[in-house]
Amino acid sequence: IIGHLIKTALGMLGL
């Protein structure tokens, strides 16, 4: 879902 995509994007930035 969109929320999952957002969390993934934030996670990548968090790296």
Curated annotation (Swiss-Prot):
Alphabetized, the UniProt keywords read:
Amidation, Amphibian defense peptide, Antibiotic, Antimicrobial, Secreted
Tissues and organs where the protein is expressed, per its UniProt entry: Expressed by the skin glands.
Q: One GO BP annotation here?
A: defense response to Gram-positive bacterium
Its chief place of residence is: secreted
Kindly list the places in or outside the cell where this protein is found, as annotated in its UniProt entry: Secreted
Q: Which GO terms describe its cellular component?
A: extracellular region
Positions carrying Leucine amide are 15
Entry annotated with the keyword Secreted: yes
Describe its function: Has antibacterial activity against a wide spectrum of Gram-positive bacteria including B.cereus (MIC=25 uM), E.faecalis (MIC=100 uM), L.lactis (MIC=12 uM), L.innocua (MIC=50 uM), M.luteus (MIC=25 uM), S.aureus (MIC=12 uM), S.epidermidis (MIC=25 uM) and S.uberis (MIC=25 uM). Lacks antibacterial activity against the Gram-negative bacteria E.cloacae and E.coli. Inhibits the formation of NO by neuronal nitric oxide synthase with an IC(50) of 12.4 uM.
The identity of this protein, by name, is Signiferin-2.1
State the organism's lineage: Eukaryota, Metazoa, Chordata, Craniata, Vertebrata
